[in-house]
């Protein structure tokens, strides 16, 4: 970490001073700064120095595991992760503060934060206790750190254990309110969603078949889908994956044997519904449910059927941004009263405290549901960027989350 010319010179001097003074927390601070700047080599040096001073530092080993992960040293990353949590599976994260802040216990697994919480639960506002359920040793005498509310970050239904005795033990010992029950999360699985939402008027939820791994080999997949009476075209994707990763639009059975799907516990085959608008574009709306109430998050408009905000080039067309702005400012008016009431009822039916939904609007005003689950990411946009208009609506979502968490935290 020797000083270099440029803006990092002071950071290097700080690291050298910390080494001389055997100050592990300062070295960890330096390592985090270097990691954020993608200076992984010097971050590793600072972390190794911190661990030489304090070999029990869970946070230093966590960051070192992250350094190894992003630099492709996967076995070393695994080893550091195991060392980090061998004796510490409840980790308290807090910033110095004179005022008492609500403390939120985050129920999660090692490396599995399905609900991104950086913006939802900022350290400036909350003390956080990360409880790593897959590392928990309930008989080792560990006491749960003080907390006011539990936020279940295990929002990916395909990754949940059924039943989960570790989660049950957490609830038994805690006695505090829980946000996002595992049972409600499990019901958002793609093949269960239609049953969960059955009876809601003015919505369409395409049929979904879940094909377990033993029947999902390329040579057997078409046969299994035929046995179930699935009709083409089908969207076939690996369980637990999002963002279009591994998805195939199959118009005939022969395509299935020619496609290589990423390894997964199962595949989902969803009946494809052409949702193209009259102008030839595909529209995907996203709303976030906070305390079961829908709040608009974005609208992506694309000439391709596989619509994602990051690939829709929204900033390239003023008309797209203006249409999105109208949705964000007046979602009820844009969707229509019938579809908006359906959206509200979906939020109630999901019974999740935090969740999201991706959907489109069909010509007759029916709401076409793509997915609804707790893994939806909410983040501010660049204040000077083309999508900065979203930030006031992002802030509305965050403020609603803050209010919900603090309301539950004060319950007796």
Where are the model-predicted features located?
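C-terminal active-site "lid" helix and adjoining low-complexity regulatory extension at the edge
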Residues: 348, 352, 361-412
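Canonical positions in the second alpha-helix
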Residues: 15-16, 49-50, 83-84
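Conserved N-proximal alpha/beta basic substrate-recognition cap immediately N-terminal to
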Residues: 90-216
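Phosphate-binding site of ATP-dependent enzymes
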Residues: 243-342, 346
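Short coil turns that delineate tetratricopeptide repeat
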Residues: 21, 55, 88-89
């Amino acid at each position: 970490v020797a000083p270099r010319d440029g803006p990092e010179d002071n950071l290097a001097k700080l690291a050298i001073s910390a080494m001389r003074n055997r100050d592990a927390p300062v070295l960890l601070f330096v390592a985090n700064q270097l990691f954020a700047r993608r200076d992984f080599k010097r971050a590793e040096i600072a972390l190794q120095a911190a661990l030489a001073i304090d070999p029990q530092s869970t946070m230093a080993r966590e960051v070192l595991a992250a350094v190894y992960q992003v630099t492709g040293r996967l076995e070393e990353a695994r080893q550091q992760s195991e060392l980090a949590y061998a004796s510490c599976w409840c980790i308290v994260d807090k910033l110095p503060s004179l005022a008492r802040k609500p403390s939120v216990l985050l129920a999660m697994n090692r490396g599995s934060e399905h609900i991104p919480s950086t913006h939802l639960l900022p350290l400036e506002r909350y003390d956080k206790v990360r409880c790593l359920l897959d590392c928990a040793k309930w008989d080792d005498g560990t006491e749960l750190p003080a907390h006011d509310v539990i936020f279940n970050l295990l929002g990916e239904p395909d990754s949940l254990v059924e039943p989960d005795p570790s989660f049950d033990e957490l609830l038994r010992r805690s006695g505090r309110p829980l946000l996002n029950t595992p049972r409600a999360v499990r019901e958002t699985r793609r093949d269960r969603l239609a049953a969960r939402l059955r009876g809601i008027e003015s919505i369409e939820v395409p049929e979904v078949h879940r094909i377990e791994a033993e029947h999902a080999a390329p040579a057997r997949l078409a046969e299994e889908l035929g046995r179930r009476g699935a009709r083409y075209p089908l969207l076939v994707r690996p369980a637990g994956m999002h963002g279009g990763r591994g998805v195939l639009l199959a118009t005939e059975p022969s395509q299935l044997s020619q496609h290589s799907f990423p390894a997964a516990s199962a595949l989902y085959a969803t009946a494809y519904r052409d949702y193209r608008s009259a102008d030839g574009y595909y529209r995907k709306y996203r709303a976030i449910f906070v305390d079961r109430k829908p709040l608009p998050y974005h609208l992506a408009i694309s000439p391709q059927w596989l619509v994602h905000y990051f690939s829709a080039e929204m900033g390239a067309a003023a008309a797209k941004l203006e249409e999105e702005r109208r949705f964000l400012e007046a979602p009820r008016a844009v969707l229509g009263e019938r579809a908006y009431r359906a959206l509200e009822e979906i939020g109630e039916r999901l019974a999740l405290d935090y969740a999201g939904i991706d959907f489109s609007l069909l010509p007759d005003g029916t709401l076409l549901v793509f997915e609804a689950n707790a893994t939806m990411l909410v983040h501010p946009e660049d204040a000077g960027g083309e999508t900065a208009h979203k930030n006031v609506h992002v802030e509305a979502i965050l403020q609603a989350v803050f209010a919900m968490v603090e309301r539950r935290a004060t319950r007796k």
